[in-house]
Amino acid sequence: NRETDSRKDFIGRLGAEKAIGDWGKWGAGFSYYHGFVYNPTTEAYEMRGNHFVKRDMGETGTYMKRQYLGLDGQFSFLSSLGKTTLRAEGLIGTQPGIAGSSKSPNYSTRPENLPENSLFKRPFLGYFFYLVQDIGASPFSAVLKYDVYDPNTKVSGNEVGAENSFTSKTDLAQSTIGIGGIYNFNKHIRLQAYYEFNFNEKSNLVKGYENDRKDNVLTVRLQYK
């Protein structure tokens, strides 16, 4: 999508990696992102305690800061079991979104000055860990992953959906445990099967989220490259 303003974002990463003899390798990195999101309305919402407060921006076309700080690390080594790869990454920051989505809008055209387009500034936290274990010299690998995304770290549980808080299901945290396997037929074709156990934060004040939703997912994919 083309840019709709002249403001520039900054993104950078500092990283290092090093081999450990002929059997292992490690790496680590720090990343930073700083940018802005266009607000097409005269209103915006920011957290104060455990609720959103509406701000009168006075005009359309203001901007809300978007900022991420990230850390990542990886370690791989060879053993009698085969190659083991461990990776972890964490991200915190501020993410402007709308009432119905914590993702920042990606506008190709300027949206209208409508209430549903007002920005909500949310402090977020996300992280994941994954393990890939090759099974000896066989073409099979096992995969295990755990990830968490909390789109609004200022509220939890029954605080979400409380009267006059302007919070909704968008502010509920999610976590996933994934297990699967990869079978490499050759260097070009591989088959992957992956099952995700999805868990959502619960709130008695958000319809449909009083309990954990039944939304586990099985994915089977044949890839050619």
Question: Predicted regions: what is each one?
Answer:
Residues N1-V37:
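Aromatic- and glycine-enriched pocket-lining scaffold segments that form the walls
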Residues D22-K225:
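Outer-membrane beta-barrel pore domains
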